[in-house]
Structures are given as structure tokens and as C-alpha cells.
Amino acid sequence: MNSFPWLTIFVGLPISAGFLIFVFPHRGNKVIRWYTIFICVLELLLMTYAFSYYFQLDDPLIQLTESYKWINFFDFYWRLGIDGLSLGPILLTGFITTLATLAARPITRDSRLFHFLMLAMYSGQIGLFSSQNLLLFFIMWELELIPVYLLLAMWGGKQRLYSATKFILYTAGSSVFLLMGALGIAFYASNEPTFNFETSANQSYPVTLEILFYIGFLIAFAVKSPIIPLHTWLPDTHGEAHYSTCMLLAGILLKMGAYGLVRINMELLSHAHSIFSSWLIIVGAIQIIYAASTSSGQKNLKKRIAYSSVSHMGFTIIGIYSISDMGLNGAILQIISHGFIGAALFFLSGTSYDRIRLVYLDEMGGMATLMPKIFMMFSILSLASLALPGMSGFFAELVVFFGIITAKKFFLMPKILITFVTAVGTILTPIYLLSMLRQMFYGYKLFNATNSYFFDSGPRELFVSIAILLPVISIGIYPDFVFSLSVDKVEAILSNYFYS
């Protein structure tokens, strides 16, 4: 048990600081923006300090644990803790949220509410990744919905209300299954419900009941990850959201679903996970092909990037359901890698829109001459997205491939077939990404756009782009940094699978 409540501070600081925005007199949008950035940076520095000094990388057990009695009526505890599985997503959350807040500079309407919602999302994300209680996990899961809905509905594009409504219907509807699964596990074979992850992990269930629990959690996490065919909210949401919101969606929100698949489905319901693994690997392979093919046909820039996110999450799904050491480590690396790359691509698409006011690729062209810095950053990060060697995505996808091949659960021919289909998906990736670069930056100049918007990337845009690019290159050169966080925890999870 940790003597100092680090995790409670990390969860409570952003939203508490957000409430202060409404308490203090309004001093202008600039003051609010820098105050929010200061809170995000302070949170990130505190997390880095605490994890550097108090987290032991070689310990697979839950660390920095905190447990406080919250509701006496049904023995509900505020229980937090982190391990190698949650450490990476927490640091990713702090990093991306800080940069997304800096990227939100053009926001001037209802600035106080906007920045409060950003900080509220920050608290919810940290709370979810550090939760060690099923009900607390659900509360933090739900805490995300209202801020994202308002960010979409109030600061989105022309179809923002449609996209926001579609988002809330999908995510809130799927959350019902998450709650049902949590209550089912808590009340099973006990008059006094327990939501504790550790207790639930040691519980055994009848096969039929475990499958029902598993399906409930799977639906909730499949919507958020997303997994086809429950992905259709994502392109519309990304297509209409402000690019700072897109950074949070692509960088963190999608990772919550993948994290839930490992933390709950894989760790708590191992037998059902084994039963569903063959089917979900097939779904993951189809998702890579389908989303990559669909992305090539998208004329809207942000929707093309959104479908590329769906395709890349297919590798995460395959890694999780390979039930192998290399596959699961590759999936975790893909979660981190795509968090950076997806956020960067949406940021660059948004800064491009700020200048040319165009969203359709067939209306663009010739931007390389007009905006060479944006062209350079867009090109480098697009190459990172297609898994160029030396970038983080290369090792993530390569290790997932190795995970499929070395998986002991599957026969040789199915493994070869899945590997082949997945490899075809990696061939489609450069097709839609390089086509996107060609349509945007080469060809004829933008005669139908106002010349006043033709200014290149400024210091803010360059700082955000380079800040994201550096960890992408660093992980690509030295992926062991991420593997060192997760390898012991992955080994502990797979110890529940006799063929791992």
C-alpha cells in the first residue's frame, strides 16, 4: 500500500483545476489557455517523477496502490494502482493531452468550458487506466462520454450534431453492456458484491456464464477500440471534430477499448478469451484489409485518416487475441505507437485546414510549394504510419507478426493464412497514405482557395509536430523502452493460459 496518494492526485488534479476556471474572474482566452497548459504540464511532470522513483519495472504486481472506503452500502472502494500494462497509456495520456491543449489555440468561443472539458477528459482517462475496481472503471469510462459529446456538438463542423449524437448512441449504448458485465461479476456467488480486480481475477465461472460476461465486455470495448462492424461512429466523429479533439480521440480514447480488452477480458475471463481468440483474430485481419481499402476511397482527409486508425487497430486486436508473449507485447507497443502517430496526423490535417479551408482531397494540390514545413512533417509522419523501419510502427507490426507465427494455440496453416492476409493489409497502407500525400501536396496549385491562408507552419505547429515525432523515432530505434514496461506483466497474464 502506497503511503502517499500519488494516483488520487493525478486523477483529481486536472478536473479540480478545471473547476477553478469558472471560479476565477475571466481574464481572457489567452490566460485560460496557458493556465490549462500549465496544469497539463504539471501533471505530466509529477507523473514522470512519481513513476521514475516509485515504480519498479521488474515487478509485475500492482504498484502505488491506494484503497479508500467510498460507499459503505455495498462495500465500494476507491481503489487505484498501476502496473506495466497501465503505465504506458498513462504517460501517453499526459503527453498527448498536453499537446492537444496547446493545439487548441484557435478556440476562442466558450473558451472556459472548452478547456474545462479537456481537463475533465484528462482526469477520466488517468482514472480509467489506474482503476483497480470494476465499478470505478465503469465510472471513469462514463466520465469520458459527456466531455467528448460536448466537444463534438459545440466545436465541430457543419454535421457536428449528427456526429455527436451518433457517438453518444454508440458509446452510451455499449456502456450498458459494460455495466451489466461488471455487476454480473461482482454479484456472482456472493451476497456481498466485490468489484476488486484482484478478487475477480481469482474467481472461476461456469463456461456459459463466463461467455455471457465476456460478450458484454467485448461489445463495450469493441465500440471504443473500434472493432468492425461497430466502428461506423468513428469516421463521422473524426470528420466533424476539432483537430484537438481528434488528437484525444485517436491518441487516447481508442486505446481505452484495447486496454479494456486486456485488463478485463483477457485477465479476468481467460477461458472465454481463449474460446473467442480464433474468431477475433480473423476479425482483426479482415479489419486491416477492409479499413485500408475503405480509406483509399475516402475523399475527406480526416475520414481517410480515421479509417487508417481503424486499420491499424486491427494489429492491436490480432496481437491481443494471439495469446502469445510477442503478440501481446506487440499489441501494447502498437497502442503506444498509434497513439502518437494518429494524434500527429489529425493535428497536421487540422493545421492544413486552418490555412486552406478545404477538407476534400480532390480540391487540394500543390501545397508542398506553399507550405514546405507542413509538407515535410506530414510526409515523415505518414511514413511512420505505414511502418517505415526506424519508426515505432515498424517494430509494433513486426512483433505482432511474430506473435501470430509463434502462437502455440493455432495450427500452422491458419497462422500462415492470417499472416498472409495481414501482410496484404500492410501493402494497402502505403497506397492510401502516399495517394493522400500526392493529392494534397503535389499537382496543381490551389487556385480556388484564398491566398491569405497560405502561410507555412509557425513555431507552435512545429513544436507540437516535433514533440510527437521524437518519441516515434525514439521508440522505433529503441523499442525495448516500451517492452521493459510491459514484458513482466504480459508474462504474468499469459501464465493463466496453458498453451502460452
From Swiss-Prot:
**So what does this thing catalyse?**
a plastoquinone + NADH + (n+1) H(+)(in) = a plastoquinol + NAD(+) + n H(+)(out); a plastoquinone + NADPH + (n+1) H(+)(in) = a plastoquinol + NADP(+) + n H(+)(out)
Which major enzyme category is it? Answer: translocase
A Gene Ontology biological process term: electron transport coupled proton transport
* Intrachain disulfide bonds: none
Per UniProt, what is one GO molecular function of this protein?
ubiquinone binding
Any one GO cellular component localisation term in the record: chloroplast thylakoid membrane
Q: Where in the cell is it found?
A: Plastid, Chloroplast thylakoid membrane
The record lists the membrane-crossing segments as 4-24, 35-55, 84-104, 113-133, 134-154, 167-187, 211-231, 242-262, 272-292, 305-325, 330-350, 386-406, 416-436, 463-483
What UniProt keywords apply to this chain's record, in alphabetical order? Chloroplast, Membrane, NAD, NADP, Plastid, Plastoquinone, Quinone, Thylakoid, Translocase, Transmembrane, Transmembrane helix
Recorded hits in Pfam families, A to Z, give: Proton_antipo_M
Zinc among keywords: no
What InterPro entries has UniProt attached to this entry? NADH_Q_OxRdtase_chain4 (IPR022997), NADH_Q_OxRdtase_chainM/4 (IPR010227), NADH_UbQ_OxRdtase (IPR003918), ND/Mrp_TM (IPR001750)
Family (UniProt): Belongs to the complex I subunit 4 family.
Identify the PANTHER family for this entry.
NAD(P)H-QUINONE OXIDOREDUCTASE CHAIN 4, CHLOROPLASTIC, NADH-UBIQUINONE OXIDOREDUCTASE CHAIN 4
Official protein name in the record: NAD(P)H-quinone oxidoreductase chain 4, chloroplastic
Please tell me the species this chain comes from.
Populus alba
- Which lineage ranks, top first, belong to the organism behind this chain? Eukaryota, Viridiplantae, Streptophyta, Embryophyta, Tracheophyta
